[in-house]
Amino acid sequence: MIILGIDPSLVSTGWGVISISGSIVNYIDSGVIKTVSKDSLVLKLGNISLMIEKLITRFNPFHVAMEEVFINKNYSSSVTLIQARGAIMSVIGRYNIDFSEYAPNKIKKAIVGAGKAEKHQVQQMVKLLMHIKKAISKDESDALATAYTASVNHQIKII
């Protein structure tokens, strides 16, 4: 079973693909979708949608998992994050792929064992759990952690 994990952002959306075979988790690939700062919001959202669609057609995931939004003090950044998530979710919906979302503290707990873990701790555990030797960004590790959380969550029924 292939799971695509997504760490949404208007600037740098992290993505990570893992495969699950029984209790074995295998790292397949990961990366970051970067948008151009001078582009309009519509172009940025269109680029994110297009790249997510390319990932879906390339990896054919059984399930897509995404980090939930948390509203912070900066209202405008929260709104743009919600818009990026909407663009991503519309692509997932068009392909009718099984979908789940997880709060950041639930993801941290699944990976590190503590909901208040630091980003570098999540990154280290993702690399350790998935036997990743190369350098990965925090956006990639967050996306891979989200995919991993989906793999251990009861919402995914392995057939």
UniProtKB/Swiss-Prot annotation:
It is an enzyme of class 3 (hydrolase). It is found in: Cytoplasm. One of its GO terms (molecular function) is DNA binding. Binds 2 Mg(2+) ion per subunit. One of its GO terms (biological process) is DNA recombination. Its cofactor is Mg(2+). Its EC number is 3.1.21.10. PANTHER family: CROSSOVER JUNCTION ENDODEOXYRIBONUCLEASE RUVC. Homodimer which binds Holliday junction (HJ) DNA. The HJ becomes 2-fold symmetrical on binding to RuvC with unstacked arms; it has a different conformation from HJ DNA in complex with RuvA. In the full resolvosome a probable DNA-RuvA(4)-RuvB(12)-RuvC(2) complex forms which resolves the HJ. Belongs to the RuvC family. This is Crossover junction endodeoxyribonuclease RuvC. It comes from Orientia tsutsugamushi (strain Ikeda) (Rickettsia tsutsugamushi).
